[in-house]
Swiss-Prot record:
GO terms for cellular component: cytosol. It comes from Aquifex aeolicus (strain VF5). Its EC number is 1.7.1.13. This is NADPH-dependent 7-cyano-7-deazaguanine reductase. The gene is queF. Substrate binds at V65, E66, L67, H84, E85.
Length: 129
């Protein structure tokens, strides 16, 4: 069996790290909305793929996320066994830790599976307890 050589995209995804860039207008409150419609991960119970649209909304303070780094970093989830809740919370926490925004919301809108549609929402301004 011949060894499979990794494609350049696989290599970029493997080494992907989130990058913060300086906010060009830190004196102003403005909302950035990012939609990632092709999010995938693996169900930790069955191993079947889960598909979702990840929606990110934030009001930056000193930093904004560099979009290519975000895209590649989100693609790292595609071969991970992780629940909807854990994936959405991990995305939220990584962005919050990196950017320290004035406001952040991450929504994981997962495609129905077994006739169940799950939406996980994490916001910096809400206490759901």
């Amino acid at each position: 069996m011949e060894a499979k050589e990794k494609k350049y995209g696989e290599i970029e995804i493997e080494k992907a790290q989130l990058e913060a860039w300086p906010n060009p207008n830190p004196e102003r409150d403005y909302m950035i909305e990012i939609t990632f419609p092709e999010f995938t991960c693996l169900c930790p119970r069955s191993g079947y793929p889960d598909f979702a649209t990840i929606k990110i909304r934030y009001i930056p303070d000193k930093y904004i996320v560099e979009l290519k780094s975000l895209k590649l970093w989100l693609n790292k989830f595609r071969n991970r066994y992780i629940s909807h809740e854990a994936a959405t919370n991990e995305i939220y926490q990584a962005l919050y830790d990196l950017l320290k925004p004035r406001f952040l919301e991450v929504v994981g809108d997962f495609h129905p599976r077994g006739n169940v549609h799950t939406v996980v929402r994490v916001r910096s301004d809400e206490n759901y307890g």
